[in-house]
């Protein structure tokens, strides 16, 4: 879930999702990819679409959307994580304020900014930049929304 209009984020995430499915021997289903805006109300509306799809889990790219999705599903009688699991991607403080708490991918946001600034400074100084793709360490914080 999240907007696909940003060519860098949306398309890269979708490509990574498709690659992970292929690596696991699973088939990609376009009907299980939901595009939405980054907001709590969008997450509430998303709950209806996700429930109707028959999906049993979601990876959401924004914590606010994930909270809306969680509340929308719980309000409609879905048991999380027993019947539906949710993982979000920013590990902001709101992931700990929900019931159940939201499992999250932990991203090194400070390091992301620092590395980006170093690369930008090198480019501005017309210095050589080796590889423009940097993969930083990340982790998974298991909480109550996943088994």
Q: Can you say where each PLM-predicted feature lies in the sequence?
A:
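Bacterial carbohydrate/catabolite-sensing allosteric modules
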Residues: 1-147
